[in-house]
């Protein structure tokens, strides 16, 4: 049986790791062991942060909606409650886009939410010391 030499596979394995580590600083892009550790960590970070990105965007959308809703005399939670009672099914991403790029359309949605809310609960509560 022929003897199997592993130099080709070893060089390919090292080359792939060093190609993935291109752009890293210092030894992490030049030395195989350091590059392998950094590439492994980078893949872990990428996996984790692809999932974290969803929550970050949701928080950003909520902040934008809240700011625009308060400018129209309603708080975020009252706006969402009013839209739910009115039967408007618009997700937070679209609401945030409307708040930024289409303020008139967003204002009409706020008015729809205000009319759907029960009486005397549509005004936001203002802090006493503000």
Swiss-Prot record:
Entry's family note: Belongs to the bacterial ribosomal protein bL20 family.
Membrane-crossing segments per the record: none
GO MF terms held by the record: rRNA binding; structural constituent of ribosome
Designated name of the protein: Large ribosomal subunit protein bL20
Sections of the chain in a coiled coil: none
Domain of life: Bacteria
Protein task: Binds directly to 23S ribosomal RNA and is necessary for the in vitro assembly process of the 50S ribosomal subunit. It is not involved in the protein synthesizing functions of that subunit.
UniProt xrefs under PANTHER family: 39S RIBOSOMAL PROTEIN L20 (PTHR10986)
Species annotation: Clavibacter sepedonicus (Clavibacter michiganensis subsp. sepedonicus)
InterPro entries documented for this protein: Ribosomal_bL20 (IPR005813), RIBOSOMAL_L20_CS (IPR049946), Ribosomal_protein_bL20_C (IPR035566)
Keyword Oxidoreductase: no
Keywords: Ribonucleoprotein, Ribosomal protein, RNA-binding, rRNA-binding
GO cellular component: ribonucleoprotein complex; ribosome
GO annotation terms (biological process): ribosomal large subunit assembly; translation
